[in-house]
Amino acid sequence: MDAISDPTFKHARSRKQVTEESPSLLTVIIEIAPKLWTTFDEEGNEKGSIIKVLEALIVFLNAHLAFNSANKVAVIAAYSQGIKYLYPESTSALKASESENKTRSDLKIINSDMYRRFRNVDETLVEEIYKLFELEKKQIEQNSQRSTLAGAMSAGLTYVNRISKESVTTSLKSRLLVLTCGSGSSKDEIFQYIPIMNCIFSATKMKCPIDVVKIGGSKESTFLQQTTDATNGVYLHVESTEGLIQYLATAMFIDPSLRPIIVKPNHGSVDFRTSCYLTGRVVAVGFICSVCLCVLSIIPPGNKCPACDSQFDEHVIAKLKRKPVVPRLKAKKKVTKP
């Protein structure tokens, strides 16, 4: 029996070892301007929609951490006066929180028996969002409410680049998720086109897909749809906050490596128009600066590019300002018969 069985075991090929799944970094950009969500509540006859979004976001982050013990998350808030890293906290924020007399027991609404990683993320988010809401109360009466979503996206890609360079031993898959709210007025005029295009170029080079979840408002968002289309991301429009966690758990958990072979829940048509640097209007045909590729719907005053301050050629400007000339048709001469 030994003579029969030994060669079998000697020549048997060993099975391939199952490789562990590479960890993933999920960076979430959430827009929490109070006036934006107040307008959304008034249009949809809802109440406390931002709280429902935050609850769904916390469950979504916990689910991402549960997939792999090496997974990482980061949350950046875009509010009316700037951006703020909610998680992980910066070193200066940690020192400031330690020096304060208030402890986390004042805001401790998380179950103490929860998994440690879940509890750390949940408690930090609840505390930082509470501080941010208190800060926004003082600024709510100001009329200047600008969108800082483009800056938050740029900061998120910067964080992804830094974390990817730090993890040299293991390959880290990264993706960006943008949670924004739509109102009755078009928000494309508020967005800055050039910063968003810079984010698209950076994400494409880093191979970091950008997913967008737009809650309420119009289904179309020109620049955000262009962002998801160029970076192989998912654009999802949700009418209300009801069932948001189900949308996040189904559409936003698609692995980047599987997206080329999976039908993504995107809209069929994408508007690839750009916006004018001066007026902010979305245009299909316009003037382009040959130096910085700035798009203009009108000829700028002074014949200078408003973005790079390049001087345009006077002969070219004269040709552009020249109105089309319609040639007159020559009257046919009547031929008289003899």
Curated annotation (Swiss-Prot):
Domain of life, per lineage: Eukaryota
ZnF region ranges: C4-type: 289-308
GO molecular function: zinc ion binding
Entry keyword annotation includes Zinc-finger: yes
Subcellular location: Nucleus
Record-listed N-acetylmethionine modification sites: M1
Annotated S-S bridges: none
Keywords: Acetylation, DNA damage, DNA repair, Metal-binding, Nucleus, Transcription, Transcription regulation, Zinc, Zinc-finger
GO CC annotation, single: transcription factor TFIIH holo complex
Major place of residence: nucleus
InterPro entries xrefs: TFIIH_Tfb4/GTF2H3 (IPR004600), vWFA_dom_sf (IPR036465)
GO BP annotations listed: nucleotide-excision repair; regulation of DNA-templated transcription; transcription by RNA polymerase II; transcription initiation at RNA polymerase II promoter
Protein family according to the UniProt entry: Belongs to the TFB4 family.
Subunit-level organization: Component of the 7-subunit TFIIH core complex composed of XPB/SSL2, XPD/RAD3, SSL1, TFB1, TFB2, TFB4 and TFB5, which is active in NER. The core complex associates with the 3-subunit CTD-kinase module TFIIK composed of CCL1, KIN28 and TFB3 to form the 10-subunit holoenzyme (holo-TFIIH) active in transcription. An additionnal subunit, TFB6, plays a role in the dissociation of the SSL2 helicase from TFIIH after transcription initiation.
Role description: Component of the general transcription and DNA repair factor IIH (TFIIH) core complex, which is involved in general and transcription-coupled nucleotide excision repair (NER) of damaged DNA and, when complexed to TFIIK, in RNA transcription by RNA polymerase II. In NER, TFIIH acts by opening DNA around the lesion to allow the excision of the damaged oligonucleotide and its replacement by a new DNA fragment. In transcription, TFIIH has an essential role in transcription initiation.
NCBIfam families per UniProt: tfb4
PANTHER family on file: GENERAL TRANSCRIPTION FACTOR IIH SUBUNIT 3, TRANSCRIPTION INITIATION FACTOR IIH TFIIH , POLYPEPTIDE 3-RELATED
Protein name: General transcription and DNA repair factor IIH subunit TFB4
Organism: Saccharomyces cerevisiae (strain ATCC 204508 / S288c)
Underlying gene: TFB4
